[in-house]
């Protein structure tokens, strides 16, 4: 996954 996607997923979690 891209860094941006990872950050978004982390934010949701």
Swiss-Prot record:
Top-level lineage group: Eukaryota
Tissue-wise expression: Expressed by the skin glands.
Keyword Secreted assigned: yes
Keyword match Secreted: yes
Subcellular location: Secreted
Keywords: Amidation, Amphibian defense peptide, Antibiotic, Antimicrobial, Secreted
Gene Ontology terms: cellular component: extracellular region
Modified residues (Leucine amide): 13
GO annotation, biological process: defense response to bacterium
Protein family according to the UniProt entry: Belongs to the frog skin active peptide (FSAP) family. Temporin subfamily.
Functional summary from the UniProt entry: Antibacterial activity against Gram-positive bacterium S.aureus.
Name the record gives this protein: Temporin-1BYa
Organism: Rana boylii (Foothill yellow-legged frog)
């Amino acid at each position: 996954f891209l860094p941006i996607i990872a950050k978004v997923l982390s934010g949701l979690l």
